[in-house]
Structures are given as C-alpha cells and as structure tokens.
Design a protein with these regions (language model features):
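Catalytic beta-strand/loop cores that center a nucleophilic Ser/Cys/Thr
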Residues: 180-260
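N-terminal secretory signal peptides
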Residues: 1-24
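A glycine-rich, often tryptophan-bearing local segment used as a flexible ligand/cofactor-contacting loop or short
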Residues: 119-205
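Extracellular ligand-binding/catalytic regions of CAZymes and related secreted enzymes
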Residues: 51-53, 78-81, 242-250, 256-328
Length: 328
C-alpha cells in the first residue's frame, strides 16, 4: 500500500490513501467512504452508516521527538486510513492537515482530532486566535480528541490555577512540569496494563485489557476539586502505575459537554510501533467516532491491521539520537 503524499498549502487537507480494499469499500469522488450492505459473516454485523455524512478533521501539530516516537504525521495518516477503511461503518469523510485548518474545514468538521507535541492550537502561530476559533467550534457542539502529547499544556498556556478551555472541552489534560498548579508524570513503563474502566460506554466496545511497553502519562489533571473527574467526565481506561507504588491512574477519558459536544483524551501511544496493538487502535478509533456523534458499532470499529511503514514514519522502531558532544 502506498499513502499519497502531496504538497498542499498550509491548512489544506492532505491526500488520502490509494489502497484498494479487499472488502468492497469504495471511496467516492466526494470523499465519502461507502460500503457493501454487510460485513464479513465472521463479524456477523450489518455495516452501519452515519445518518448524515460526518467529517473528521485530523490536525497534526509540530513534533521534535526521535524517530519511532510520536511520529505525529504518520500517526495522523494512519488514523485517517483506519477511518477510511472501517469494516463495519461507513458514511464518514476525513481530512488531515499539518497546520491550523482553514475556515471551510473548521466549519464542516463533526469532530477535530489533534496529534502533536503539546496541544497544537497553543503551538501553532496565533494561539489566542486559534483558541477563539476552536471555541466557536466547541459551542457548535463539535467533538474534540487529543492523542498522547497533544493532551499536554505548558505552564505558559494555563492560568495560575490551571484553568484552560481544554479542561472543559475534553475533561482533563497532561500538565507539563512547567505548570504552576500541578505536575503530571511522563515515564516509560516496560509493562503497562491498560484496563477498561467503563464497560457499558460506547467507546469501550470491542476492546479488552492489554499490556504494552509505552509511556501512558499518569497524574493527569482533571480540575481543582482534588483532581477528581467532573461529574460529566468518564474514565474509560485505567492502569495501576507506577509499579513501585501503584494506584489506579486514568489514561483515557471522555466528557459530554453542556454545549452537546463530546471530548476524548488518551495519553498513548508514545512508541509508533504500538499502533499495531489492535485493542489500543480500536479504543482510539472508537473515541473519534463517538465524538463525531456516530453510533459506535456493537463490537467497536473494525479495521485491518495496518502496515506501519505505509504511512511514511521516520522509523517504525525507536531510534535513539546521538548524544550531543560535550565541549570543554
């Protein structure tokens, strides 16, 4: 499979995959994914279709992490490809941009997905304007998703008490060590077991407990009330971390906002290779679909296992950068 790479103007969508599906999926010229009447008998469910074509806007922010980690551009393309090739859901459009999205994309998005080093609206030029535009989207009921470090905020991004719109839009965030009010923890764990925490929630459909070598952030920030999740925030996945002093940490969560919008945050994957983990990938794609107000299929979003090299990462495996020379 080859992912089409084009030099689009900033804020314009990047080309989609040309891969031919083996399950009779067709991409129309309008960009809507259409499917046959039913999926494989082995799955046993009729393919669902969004009531109206929904649009997922994936925004890739800057990243300076070593090859094989974060790989935000490849991760954005991978999520788009997965949503384009869902085996049991159709009627969804996707766009990916690597800059602040143009108004036409913001106006038509059902949900906006961020991946990057720290919360991209604060990292792109004109952060206050970006947040104002995003606020307009949120007031309209648009969903929001942040993946791994895109959940993160610097101390300079937040008020002294930790307030930031992301806390309301998504229900929580990763507080960088520069934050004055709280410090979340970023540490790589050799065996982090991720456990479903809300079995009846639609985002929990079809994925089971899994263990992986990764960097699920812990001590994430959920508000000034003793760092407890707000009543409209649901813990979706937890992990007993750190191993030397374990407590139940929330590593994926969602919110249903008063403006009718939905938010979903997940603090993995750090290592690009972990996109191979089917349960993790399904959890993320379920979350995106749910925030777009699309019915999550009974067994969760079903996709083929991706070939990670297809999405043009710097590296699938982690490559440590040479240490900088020390001069006398």
């Amino acid at each position: 499979a080859v992912i089409e790479m084009t030099n689009k103007p900033a804020g314009q969508p990047i080309g989609s995959s040309k891969r031919n599906s083996r399950r009779n999926f067709i991409k129309t010229t309008s960009g809507v994914v259409a499917a046959g009447a039913a999926v494989s008998p082995a799955i046993g469910w009729s393919a669902l279709k969004a009531e109206e074509p929904s649009r997922v806007l994936i925004v890739v922010g800057p990243s300076k992490h070593p090859p094989g980690t974060h790989e935000v551009a490849a991760g954005g393309r991978l999520m788009k490809h997965g949503l384009e090739h869902m085996e049991n859901l159709s009627g969804v459009k996707m766009d990916v941009v690597e800059a602040w999205p143009e108004k036409s994309l913001r106006d038509t998005a059902s949900t906006i997905v961020f991946i990057g080093d720290m919360f991209p609206p604060n990292r792109f030029p004109n952060p206050q304007q970006n947040l104002a535009y995003l606020d307009t989207m949120m007031r309209r009921g648009v969903g929001i998703v942040c993946v791994h470090y895109a959940t993160g905020l610097h101390g300079k991004d937040v008020k002294p008490d930790g307030d930031h719109p992301l806390l309301r839009w998504m229900g929580g965030y990763f507080a960088n060590r520069s934050c004055p009010h709280h410090e979340s923890i970023a540490k790589i764990f050799s065996d982090a077991t991720i456990t479903p925490a809300a079995r009846k929630h639609p985002v929990s459909r079809g994925w089971n407990e899994f263990t992986l070598h990764d960097e699920p952030y812990i001590n994430n920030y959920f508000g000034a009330d003793g760092n407890q999740l707000a009543p409209n925030v649901t813990a979706l996945a937890t992990s007993m971390l750190p191993p030397e002093s374990p407590k139940r940490e929330t590593v994926a969560w969602c919110v249903e906002r008063p403006d009718s919008g939905r938010g979903f945050g997940i603090v993995m994957p750090h290592f690009y290779k972990n996109w191979r983990v089917e349960d993790l990938r399904r959890l993320i794609l379920n979350g995106i679909v749910w925030t777009a107000k699309i019915q999550v299929p009974p067994g969760g979003v079903r996709t083929e296992s991706p070939n990670l090299t297809d999405f043009n990462p710097e590296s699938v495996e982690f490559v440590r950068r040479p240490a900088k020379p020390k001069y006398p």
